[in-house]
Amino acid sequence: MEVLMAERANLVFHNKSIDGTAMKRLISRLIDHFGMAYTSHILDQVKTLGFKQATATSISLGIDDLLTIPSKGWLVQDAEQQSLILEKHHHYGNVHAVEKLRQSIEIWYATSEYLRQEMNPNFRMTDPFNPVHIMSFSGARGNVSQVHQLVGMRGLMSDPQGQMIDLPIQSNLREGLSLTEYIISCYGARKGVVDTAVRTSDAGYLTRRLVEVVQHIVVRRTDCGTVRGISVSPPNGMMPEKFFIQTLVGRVLADDIYMGPRCIATRNQDIGIELVNRFITFRAQPISIRTPFTCRSTSWICRLCYGRSPTHGDLVELGEAVGIIAGQSIGEPGTQLTLRTFHTGGVFAGGIAEHVRAPSNGKIKFNEDLVHPTRTRHGHPAFLCFIDLYVTIKSENILHNVNIPPKSFLLVQNDQYVEAEQVIAEIRAGTSTLSFKEKVRKHIYSDSDGEIHWSTDVYHAPQFTYGNVHLLPKTSHLWILLGGPCRSSLVSLSLHKDQDQMNTHSLSVKRRYTYKLSVTNDRVRYKFFSSDFYGKKKNRIPDYLDLNRIICTGYCNRIYPAILHENSDLLSKRRRNRFIMPLQSIQERENESPGISIEIPINGIFRRNSILSYFDDPRYRRKSSGITKYGTIEMHSLVKKEDLIEYRGVKEFRPKYQMKVDRFFFIPEEVHILPGSSSIMVQNNSIIGIDTQITLNIRSRVGGLVRVERKKKGIELKIFSGDIHFPGETDKISRHSGVLIPLPPGTGKINSKESKKLKNWIYVQRITPSKKGYFALVRPVITYEKRDGLNLATLFPPDLLQERDNVRLQVVNYILYGNGKPIRGISDTSIQLVRTCLVLNWDQDKKSSSSEEAPASFVEIRTNGLIRHFLRIDLVKSPISYIVKRNDPSGSGLLSDNGSDCTNINPFSSIYSYSKARIQQFLNPNQGTIHTLLNKNREFQSLIILLSSNCSRMGPFAGVKYHNVIKESIKNKKDPRISIRNSLGPLGSAPPIANFFSFSHLLTHNQILVTNYLQLDNIKETFQVIKYYSMDENGKIYNPDPCNNIILNPLNLNWYFRHHNYCEETSTIISLGQFICENVCIAKNRPHLKPGQVIFVQVDSVVIRSAKPYLATPGATVHGHYGETLYEGDILVTFIYEKSRSGDITQGLPKVEQILEVRSIDSISMNLQKRIEGWNKCITRILGTPWGFLISAELTIVQSQISLVNKIQKVYRSQGVQIHNKHIEIIVRQITSKVLISEDGMSNVFSPGELIGLLRAERMGRALEEAICYRAVLLGITRASLNTQSFISEASFQETARVLAKAALRGRIDWLKGLKENVVLGGMIPVGTGFKGLVKPSKQHNKALLETKKKNLFEGEMRDILFHHRNFFDSFLLKKFHDPSEQSFIGFNDS
C-alpha cells in the first residue's frame, strides 16, 4: 500500500478538459504500454466515472438554451442592403444576371459564415455552461453546422439538381421558418426521411462492390522482394504533420535511410512513432516506403508491403484476409457521409475571397502603370495587378504601406480618400491549377414586348450563317425598345405607311392583328373602311394627307424639299435604307458643313453601278421658292431622264448621256398658296414692303411686286423682289419669258465680294397688267457655277480615302429641276438645286469575275476630335460576316455629329404653323406612331405601335423661348409627358439611328487608347480612339472633347456607388439615337431620365423612347436579329459561364462512388491543355528509351493511384471520418492493376484489346524478349469485379448468365483461389492466420528461393539501365505532380 502511495506521489497531475481527440490519444498510448486486456479494464472505470458525473450534473436541454446571436440582426440587414443595391445595378444594366447571382450568393454565404464564427465566442462569453455549447463543442453530440442552424441562420440551400437557390433562409430553427423558407429548406434537408433511406441502400451497395473487387486479396508471403517504393517528402507547409505521421506509421521502409554517412533506418524495417519523430527532427530526405502498390505478387499481397495490422500494431499475420477488411472499412463509414452538403453550388472557389482593408483614414497612392483596369466577377470596376503592388496610405502625418499580392483586384482609384477598415483590395483565393470547372448555361428572358437593339458589332456564329445566333465580341448593352406588336390578318389595311401617326382606336393593340400592306405609289387620298367591332362600316378619311404636309416615308430623317407633286417623281420614292451623317440645326443652315446622305441596300450588298450616296451641297441650297434657268446659249438641255433602275432595294445609276452644265441661275420669289376662301389684304400688281400683312396670319418676307392668280386649288400669291422699269422700246423684251442679261462687273446693286469674280446677271421679265401698257420687272438673280470643287477630295478628307485598284467612285452632278420650271417651297424648308451622286463601280476582273456584289459595313474612326463613320465596301466577303445591319429589314441607320452643332434640333419642329386645336389633338394619349417591320420574306408587314405611354419627354429646358401655345398646354396640364408632340415629327424613327456609336467598354479610365483599324478601302494608317469617360463622385463627366457622344450613366462610370438621388450639374450632350441609362441627370434640378433611346431632339426638349437595358459580356450568345420584335418571355441572351467544381457539387458518398467507378467529369478545365503540353516536352525524352512503354505506363499508373487515394481521403476527411490509407490503397490497386493491349505491336501472346494484369504483361515481355505494347486503363470497381481470374466470383456478382456462357465457350478454368468461389461451392476457405500450419513446406519451396535470387539479379541489371533516369524522374514528379492542396507521397523510386 505504501508503495502505491509513493508511486501516486510521483505521478503528474493534469488539469485539463479532455475531448474526443485527447481521449483517442490516451487509449492508443494505453494499448501501446499495457496491451488490450488491461486497457479495456481501465476504460471501464473511465466509463463508470463519466456516467456518475453526468447523472450528478443532470444536463437537460430545453428550447431556452438556444440563444440567438445578438449581432445577427444587423448582419442580415447589411446583407439585405447590399442585395438591394445589387438589384438596382441590375435594373440599370450595370451587372448582368450571372454576376448578380454570384454576388448575391457570396453576400449571403459570407453573412452565414460570420454568424457561424460568432457562435462559439458568444456562448463562451454569455453562458459557458450552456448545455448546447457543452454538448456540441465538446464533440459529444452534434456539430457546429447543426448548432449554427439552430441559433444562427440556415443560409443558402440547393435544389435537387445541386443548383443554388439564391433566396437565403434568414431565420434559424429557434425563431421558426416562414412558409417559403420551410419549402426551400425541405430541398436541402440531409437528415430527411428520403435522404437517410437512400443513403443506407447506397452505402450498402458500395460496400458490396468494394468487397467483391478485393475479396481474393490475402496475405500469402512474407516478402515479394520488390525494389520499388513510394517516396514521401518530409512535412512542409503544404502537408500537415498529422497526415505525415498517419502516412508513415505502420509502414515498412523500402530503402535504407542515411543521415550523412550514418544509417538511421534499414530496408524492410517497420516504422513506429519514434522513428517518425526522428525523421521529422532530422528532416530526412524523401523517405521511400513499401505500399500495396509496390507489391509484386499478382493476386495476393506480402506482409512487408502491407505493413502493420491496424488492429494490433504488429506486422500482419500470414493468411489474413486484408482485402475484405479494406472493403468494409471504406464502405461502412459511407452511411455517415452525407449525400449532399449545405454549401453547394460551387459558385465561389473555396470560401470567401480575402479582403485587404485600409489601416487608417487617408489618401491612397499607387503606381498606375502596374495595374490594368478590368471588371471583377461581380461586374464592379477594378484594377488588376500582375505583380506585387505597394500601396501607400497617407494620413495626417503617418505613412502606411500595404503590400498587395499579385493577381489581386484593387477596388479603389489613385489619390482617393479611404476610411479605416474600408476594403481596398480583394485577394483571389489561390485555387489549385487543376481545379475542374464546369460550364453552365444561363438564359436571360425578356421582360417586355419590343424590338431588340445592340450597340456593338456582333459576330455570327460560323455554323449558323443565316441563323439568329450571334456572339458578342465585347461587353455591351442590349436594349429592348418598348412597343406593342400587332399581328393578324383580320383587317386588310393598305394605308398605313411607316412613321404615320394614327389613332390607336382604329386598331386594337390588345388583340394582335396583322395588316397586309399593299404598297402603292399613288398619292391620292385613300378611303378605307375600318370594321368597327360593332360591325358597322364607317367611311373614314385619315387626316394626315394635307397638301402642305410632307409625308415622310421610309426612315429619312432629313427634310427633303417640299416640291409640288408634279416634279416629285425622283424624291417621292420610299427611301427605306438611307442613313445620314450630319443633322444640322436650322439657324446654321447657311454656313453648315456639307452633309452626305448615303443609301445602303436592304441586304447591305452593293451591285455594280449602285448609287452609293447623294450629296447635297449647301451652296446650292435656297430657302425661298423661285425659278431655275440654265446658263449660256450654247448649252443643250440637261439629261432628260436619269436611268434610275430600282430592283430589290438597290438603286443603280445608268446615265444614257450626261451633260456638263457650266452654270445655272436661280431667280428667287416668294410663293404663298392660300385657300380659295381666305381674304387677301394686298392688291394684284401692287408693290409692297417687307413684313406687310398679306392675310390674317401671313406676313411677307421680301418686298416687291405682288401677283395674285386664282387657280382651281386655291389662290397662288407670288411676291417678286426687284425694280420696275417702264421701257421705251418694245422690241428688247420678248413677250413670253424672261431674259437673263449680264451686267458689267462692278456695276449694279449687288456689290458683294463675289461680284469681283463673277459677272452679275439680272433677270428681266415682261409683265402686262392691262391692255394699255406693260412694264419690265428687273429681278436679282443668284448665279451658280457648277464648280469643279465637288470631287472626292471635298467629300471625304484626303487622308481618309484611298481607292483600291478595282473599286471606283464616280461623281455625277445633276440639276434637280427642269429649265424654267417653278420651284415651290412651303414655309421654312430649304430647296436643293443641285444634287451630286456618287456612283460605285468596279472593274470586271477576269480573276474575280464572280464578285458581282460588294458587302458594306460600317467603320467608326475618330480624327481631330470628331467621330466619323465610314462605310467600308469590300469586294470579298469576310469570313465573319459583320451583320451590323445585314439582316435588318427595317433599314440601316447611322448618324453622327460633324462637330458643327452639339444639340441636334429636330428638323420637323418648324414645318407646321401651330394652332391650339392641332396641338391638343396630338397630345391625345391614345395616339401612337406606326412603325413598320417587313418580315423576312417581305410578303406582309407587321406593325409596331408606339404609344405615348412608351415615350417620356424631358424638358422644357430653361432659357429657351418657345411658342405660347405650348406654354399654355404645359401650364394647363401638370404632367410633363403630355406635351410630347408639339410637332408632328416622326416619333419612333429609332432603328435607323440606333447603331451610330458603339458603347465604350464599361471601364472607367480616361487614359486608355484603343486602336481601331480603319478599313475604308484598305487604308494603312491607324487611328487612336479615346472612348473612355470618367465620372467623379459628384456625377460630373470629364470627357476628352466636348463634341463626343457620351454614354450618360452615372453608375457605370462611377467608382463610389453613391446615393442614387444625388445629382449635380452635368454636361449635356444629347444626340439623336443615343441610348441613355436610367438615372442620368441631363440638367440641374431636372427630373431623372427613364432609360431609353433619344428619338426626338428639339430646342427645348427631348423625347425618349422607353427601353430596358440588359448587360451582356463577351462570349454571350444573343438570340434574335437586330431590330427584331420580341415578345415578353422570349430568350434574349444566353450566358455561358464557368463555375469551379469545388468538392461541393458532388459530395460525400456520390463523390466516392464517382471516383471508384472512374466516371469522367463533364468538362475539362481551361488550363489543362497547357499543363499537358508541358508534360509532353519532358516525357518525350523518356519515351525514346527501349523501356519506353514500361516507363510511361508505370508513370501513368503510379500517378493515378496516388491521386485517387488522395481524392477519396479528402472526401472522408472533410466529413471527419478517419480511414487508413492502406485500405484505400488495396482497392485502388485493384482498379489500376490492368492494362489494355494496344494494336501498335501485334504480339504472339495477347490479342489487341485484351485486359491483362500489369505484372503479367511485364513478365511476358521479359520472357519473350519482345516489347508488348499496352496502355494503362482505369477500371471502375464494377468492371474490375467482372474482370477477375475466377468466373464463379464474377457470375455471383452480376450478369450471371452472360458470364457463365462466355466462360463455357472459352473453356475457362477457375482455380478457386479466392474466398467467394469456395463459399459458393461450399469448400474450405483458403484464409485464416492458422492456415500456414496446415500446408507443409515441400521441395518446391526451396526451388522458389533459388528463382527469387535469380530474379533479384535481373532486377539489379534493370536497375542499372534505369539508373540514369532516376534523378530525372524524381525531380520531374516532384515538380509536376505536387498538388499543394493534397498531401501525399509523391513520385516513385527505383531503388
Curated annotation (Swiss-Prot):
Q: Which domain of life is it from?
A: Eukaryota
SUPFAM superfamilies attached here? beta and beta-prime subunits of DNA dependent RNA-polymerase
Q: Where does Zn(2+) bind?
A: 224, 295, 302, 305
Quickly give the catalysed reaction: RNA(n) + a ribonucleoside 5'-triphosphate = RNA(n+1) + diphosphate
UniProt keywords (A-Z) are: Chloroplast, DNA-directed RNA polymerase, Metal-binding, Nucleotidyltransferase, Plastid, Transcription, Transferase, Zinc
What is a single Pfam family found in this protein's UniProt entry? RNA_pol_Rpb1_5
Q: Which GO terms describe its molecular function?
A: DNA binding; DNA-directed RNA polymerase activity; zinc ion binding
Cellular localization per UniProt: Plastid, Chloroplast
What is the required cofactor set for this protein?
Zn(2+)
Q: Does the keyword Transferase apply?
A: yes
| Gene Ontology CC terms | chloroplast; DNA-directed RNA polymerase complex; mitochondrion
Q: Which residues form the signal peptide?
A: none
Note the subunit structure: In plastids the minimal PEP RNA polymerase catalytic core is composed of four subunits: alpha, beta, beta', and beta''. When a (nuclear-encoded) sigma factor is associated with the core the holoenzyme is formed, which can initiate transcription.
Tell me, what does this protein do in biology?
DNA-dependent RNA polymerase catalyzes the transcription of DNA into RNA using the four ribonucleoside triphosphates as substrates.
**Name of this protein:** DNA-directed RNA polymerase subunit beta''
**Organism expressing this protein natively:** Coffea arabica
Name the gene.
rpoC2
